Design a protein with these regions (language model features):
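Core alpha/beta nucleotide-donor-binding catalytic domains of modification enzymes
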Residues: 1-206
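Flexible helical/loop "lid" subdomain adjacent to adenine-nucleotide binding pockets
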Residues: 124, 130-297
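AMP-forming adenylation/ATP pyrophosphatase catalytic core
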Residues: 2-29, 48-50, 54, 86, ...
Length: 382
């Protein structure tokens, strides 16, 4: 198994010579296996190692136990240890997002800040995702509805992020832990089926492997790799399309002639325009791409709102995507009013809306960015 991971790291050129590796270690079996292997590889591949543990301030004494355990093991193994503490529930309220999203953001912040302290660009951030995580992520995105990018989202190398264990199944990791007598902790939230990913992990994927194919998870991982290659190709073509568009200070103008070309390439070009203007890929989806494509078929003056204060406007010569000004905001929000009836979908300039009225019986309110529950008794002028 050690040789397998070493070969995978070399094959994907994950770690450069004399690099720093910041290993994200939660204390769970996956991250402890990764840390143990990186320690063995440190001398062979010639890199420096540092552990970053993120305390989310969610699980109370259990989270304190995890941090203390990782710090103790790092002391025994001679690895520098950094613990970053955040109050994720409070940050989630402040940032108006779910705790899972806030947790992702603070982890990213922790790694970025620790990397900045290294004063070198020769570093990697090692995460302990395995092949089962890859299969579960593919199933998760597939069930929610996703394009190629979502289905191919977990790769061995993405920028500074590396995933050395992506070649291993979870059962291989369990075997390595026992064989090397590595102590680890178990996050109690991973044992429940309260989260969609846990249901996929504990019920759906095992059932698929039991009833259909025992290597289904492995095949899904290979499919994700193929989709990654397709994603790279279409992204490259989208950038080539964007190179032929007119760049302006506040936006990008996509000429009408471009909308006559391959729609998939045009869609990728639009996604690259979103990234160029916002420096973000998250929160942009096929819905926003379709909104821009629809503008090409509308009359001049039509517009749509996009994430991160961007908007699209139909002009005579094409579709402009750029940052909202005060004048453009007024054009967008005071364009017209819409009636949205319960149980039916309504396509508006702001996107597609659907409403539903139901009796609340104490269910857990979902923390989703585009799904909101409103108390009917508190709505005025209803």
């Amino acid at each position: 198994m050690y040789r397998k991971v070493k070969a995978y790291i070399l094959e994907n050129e994950m770690i450069q010579e004399n690099a720093w590796v910041l290993a994200g270690v939660s204390g769970g079996g996956d991250s402890m296996t990764m840390l143990h292997m990186l320690l063995r590889l440190r001398q062979e591949l010639g890199f420096s190692l540092r552990v970053v543990h993120v305390h989310h301030g969610i699980r109370g004494e259990e989270a304190d136990r995890d941090a203390a355990m990782v710090e103790k093991i790092c002391g025994q193994w001679g690895v520098p240890f950094i613990c970053r503490r955040f109050d994720v529930p409070s940050l989630a309220l402040s940032w108006k997002c779910g705790t899972e999203e806030a947790g992702r953001m603070v982890r990213q912040k922790a790694f970025q800040e620790e990397a900045a302290l290294l004063n070198t660009d020769n570093y990697q951030i090692a995460l302990a995702h395995n092949q089962d995580d890859l299969a579960e992520t593919l199933l998760f995105h597939l069930s929610r509805g996703s394009g190629i990018r979502g289905l191919a989202s977990m790769r061995p190398v993405v920028g500074k992020v590396i995933r050395p264990l992506l070649c291993l199944r979870r059962q291989e990791i369990d075997h390595y832990l026992k064989e090397n007598e590595i102590f680890y902790v178990t996050d109690s939230t991973n044992l429940t089926d309260d989260y969609t990913r846990n249901k996929i992990r504990h019920k759906i994927l095992p059932e698929i492997e039991k009833e259909l194919n025992p290597k289904a998870g492995e095949h899904m991982a290979k499919t994700a790799q193929i989709l990654s290659m397709a994603e790279d190709y279409f992204t490259r073509k989208g950038r080539e399309m964007l190179d032929r568009c007119k760049k302006e200070e506040q936006g990008i103008l996509i000429g009408m002639e471009i909308f006559q070309e391959d729609p998939l390439i045009v869609s990728y070009g639009i996604m690259e325009a979103f990234y160029l203007l916002s420096s973000r890929r998250r929160d942009f989806s096929a819905v926003h791409v379709q909104s821009v494509l629809s503008l090409a078929k509308n009359q001049a003056g039509s517009c749509c709102s996009l994430p991160y204060r961007l908007m699209g406007i139909r002009k005579y010569e094409g579709v402009w995507i750029g940052k909202q000004t005060e004048q453009e905001k007024r054009q967008l929000f005071f364009h017209e009013e819409w009636e949205i009836f319960p149980g039916k979908k309504a396509d508006t300039l702001l996107g597609t809306f659907e409403t539903r009225i139901f009796l609340y019986q104490g269910e857990k309110i979902p923390e989703k960015k585009y799904t909101k529950w409103l108390d009917y008794d508190k709505i005025k002028n209803k």
